[in-house]
């Protein structure tokens, strides 16, 4: 399957999602405390982003660019990259309403057109990290990073994908698919995403000059409720198994 076809399908899916959910919630995300995933676990609890003062950053698959907004507020110089014009338009509206400004680039997360070694931080929270083939976007992230720079990204957990039925049903408590060979998942109108097993991801990161520093497996906190829009797992399920992962790696 040509990546351009997948990108077009994902652009359509996120244009729809922006109309249904992300546009009306973008401003609150821009102005809120930095947080991760569907359970909105604060970065202050996880300690992932750290001190970014003066750093050049690239967000791959930025969507409405709230992560880039957090970085800009913290003193970084972010660039947001996304393929969906509707979401970039929402990001520009949020810029106008908040006064927070940074460059936005309409491009594929694995073909940004940005210069080599131009970033101290490459970050993706459910952006290119799942919507672009990792064999395309991870080499691009490595190309963008300077030596010593960090790659930080969030994706679905492996166990949540293995327990996810075909279609739009939520993860179950039984395995629904084999782990061997997992990579590309076509969810129809919901888009095409990419998930690989831990061992394969470790090999891919290391092959691109990236040393893994942390892997965080996130569970739903006590009192969390199932997300109103991103309901791929229930809160009850995610209190028992991790639904999301954050990876942190550093460029050699």
Where are these regions (language model features)?
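N-terminal, positively charged/glycine-rich alpha-helical extensions of SAM-dependent methyltransferases
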Residues: 1-28, 32
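Conserved class I S-adenosyl-L-methionine
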Residues: 150-183
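Class I SAM-dependent methyltransferase SAM/SAH-binding core
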Residues: 56-111
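A short glycine-rich, Lys/Arg-flanked "PGG" loop and its adjoining helix->strand segment in the class I
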Residues: 135-150
